[in-house]
Amino acid sequence: FAPGARVIHIDIDPAEIGKNRVADVPIVGDVKTVLQALIPQIEQLHKEYGKPDLTTWWKLLDKWVEQYPVAYEEPTDGTLAPQWVVQQLSAEADPNTIWVSGVGQHQMWATQLIEFHHPHQWISSGGLGTMGFGLPAAIGAEIGSQQYFDGKKPVWLIDGDGSFQMTSEELATAFMEGTPIKIALLNN
């Protein structure tokens, strides 16, 4: 984990603070409440001292993107590379799509290969490793899309065969709740 980083850990449960990594700044509290209190202080610091110059940081990120491009080998046996499938879905999908990912290699491919057009388009369990997360999360995203966006934001689930098997029985829930999610199931 970034050895030079200062870690600010905010958690409502004091037992979680510093559990996986020593926190330089441990804060026990609800993250929403803590951030609402911190934001005005940060804005005041920006007024007094200016915002930090992130030009060097962005140049470094651009260099890494150029130096380590996302690449994959095309199969020679006539099958489709899962990365190609994700890339094609991204290219063809509605730009307002809400993308959901299960846990596994497909999660990394989706993170790297989907082109996001707007904020709040990506739902993933991140590094928590919660296999089976994808389908229930996609159902929830679709219900949210119907309630808040009149269903105008389609939901795509990118999932792997192992992750999908953890909660595949929830397809019945998706059907009963009328959630027309789309699923790309990758068998790698």
Where in the sequence are the language-model features?
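Active-site diphosphate/adenylate-binding microenvironment
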Residues: K59-Y148
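Acidic active-site catalytic centers that drive phospho-/nucleotidyl reactions
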Residues: D11, G102, D161
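Conserved beta-strand elements of the Class I
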Residues: I8, I98-V100, W156
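Thiamine diphosphate
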Residues: I17-V28, K32-L38, W109-N188
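Glycine-rich, acidic loop regions that bind phosphate or pyrophosphate groups
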Residues: F1-K59
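Glutamine-centric residue-chemistry signal
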Residues: H9, Q105-Q107, Q165
